[in-house]
């Protein structure tokens, strides 16, 4: 689920060339476009909790915020369905957005406390999309 070193180098540049954009669109399709838009709209947050120095990445999606463990996991439905169950993809656009944001240092840094982290995790770890609506 990680980007290749070549991809990381391309994304680390200040400006993407048209060739770079074409490459990523061909490889990742709409996911790249959505991920880049999320980054450009400043919807990626890096929380740093004190005193533990725990880092948590959040990507704001269309309907809620998603907890992202870089290169590993996302709490969104797409990750569960496309990556875990059907294995038709190796990442959702939230994971891609987090990697792009980190490489480009284009994210909001949020300082908070460990006490607040416990409360936030209750919301972030929600998987109520799995529940059947009554």
Give the predicted meaning of each segment.
Residues 1-134:
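Long, low-complexity, compositionally biased intrinsically disordered regions
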């Amino acid at each position: 689920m990680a980007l290749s070193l070549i991809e990381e180098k391309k994304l680390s540049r200040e400006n993407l060339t048209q060739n770079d954009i074409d490459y990523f669109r061909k490889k990742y399709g709409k996911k790249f476009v959505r991920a880049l838009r999320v980054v450009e709209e400043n919807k990626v947050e890096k929380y740093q909790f004190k005193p533990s120095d725990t880092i948590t990445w959040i990507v704001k999606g269309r309907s809620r915020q998603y907890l992202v463990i870089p290169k590993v996991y996302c709490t969104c439905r797409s990750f569960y369905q496309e990556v875990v169950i059907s294995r038709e993809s190796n990442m959702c656009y939230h994971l891609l957005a987090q990697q792009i944001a980190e490489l480009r240092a284009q994210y909001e840094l949020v300082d908070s406390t460990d006490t607040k982290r416990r409360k936030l995790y209750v919301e972030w770890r929600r998987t109520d999309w799995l529940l059947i609506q009554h």
